[in-house]
Amino acid sequence: MNSIFKSHGKLLITGEYFVLKGAKSLSIPTKFFQTLKIENIKESKLIWVSYDKNNDPWIEATFDLSNLKILSTKNKETLFLKKLLCSAQKINSNFLKTSSGFKVVSTMNFERSWGLGSSSTLINNISKWANIN
């Protein structure tokens, strides 16, 4: 089963650091987004590539699906991705529990440096895939 998830970036009206300290905020969605395309593969691996706006990879990694051990990577962001996947598994213990594997391709149509939510859209897409809120 192949799946596609899409999450729009956001404009945070008040300062992000105030929100992190508990302040209320208003955000509005933008036309910019990140997609997550999941394709089933036969191998029991998770192969992940995330592309930025210029179609350059910013995350490239292969994980052992049984324990999410990083088998190969070229990017330090892979540790953040592993943390997200492990957190999703803690909430939904059936997430990624399969005899087959996955090839995941993430793409965004905005610059990561714009502050529109490259991390938050990735988190939201993984949450949708894991069927968690």
What is the role of each PLM region?
Residues W114-N133:
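DPxDG-like acidic metal-binding loop motif
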